[in-house]
Amino acid sequence: VAKQDRAVRTRQILIRAAAEVFAADGYALASLSMISKRAGVSPGALHFHFASKDDLAREVESEATDSGRQLAEGCRGTAGSALQVLVRTAFGLVLAAADDPVLRAGLKLSGDPSRKSDAELLNWWRGLVRELVVQARDAGELAQDVSADDATTTIVAATVGFAVIAMAEAEWPSAERLTRFWSLVLPWLAAAPERVPDLVTHGAQRHHRVH
């Protein structure tokens, strides 16, 4: 059991180290030797867990997507309407990506042209945004002249953009900046503009990364 526990810990250390390297340098420049050195693990131990750099990258993408799903489920449990869940989840994902190298690496790997990726994290996020937008539309929360496609495209592009900037400037995304973004977007998106302040406040709750 102790040996199994050590193996699990070593695997997680390697995944985090790989995420830090991928997030900082990209897939093409990253090497297994860089990752093993960062993890403080021998090359042999790394190869015991992962046969190739691509195997590591796929595992990082998978863990990033799992982290996103867990965050989204937590937001579903604390928010009411679909629009509230959407705003709160977007706040959480952007701020988590700024702090979590696994999420940052998952986003970076999804769009890295140097490797073939299933874009697992991006596809999951796009799908979730569309699901919540459609639910909001069906509940009468969206303005009549707003299409689900336009809303999904705008929100996905903006949130991923925030996260991409965080890769170069970790302090840039903040609850304050996200509040300003949603204060601009929600009057166009929401059927009831008078709800915008409450939607923004609800979305920012418990997210205090303000600079």
Language-model features: locations:
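Secondary-structure edge/capping motif, primarily at the C-terminal ends of alpha-helices
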Residues: 75, 104, 162, 166-169
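All-alpha amphipathic helical-bundle segments outside canonical DNA-binding/catalytic cores
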Residues: 84, 117-124, 138-154, 172-176
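Short secondary-structure transition hinges
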Residues: 91-142
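C-terminal peripheral helix-coil segments that are non-catalytic and often amphipathic
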Residues: 123-139, 168-211
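Basic, helix-initiating cap at the start of DNA-binding domains
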Residues: 1-25, 29-38, 54-58
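Short hydrophobic/aromatic patch on the recognition helix
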Residues: 39-50
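Hydrophobic alpha-helical connector segments
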Residues: 59, 70-99, 103, 148, ...
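Hydrophobic alpha-helical segments that form the core
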Residues: 91-95, 144-165, 173-188, 202-206
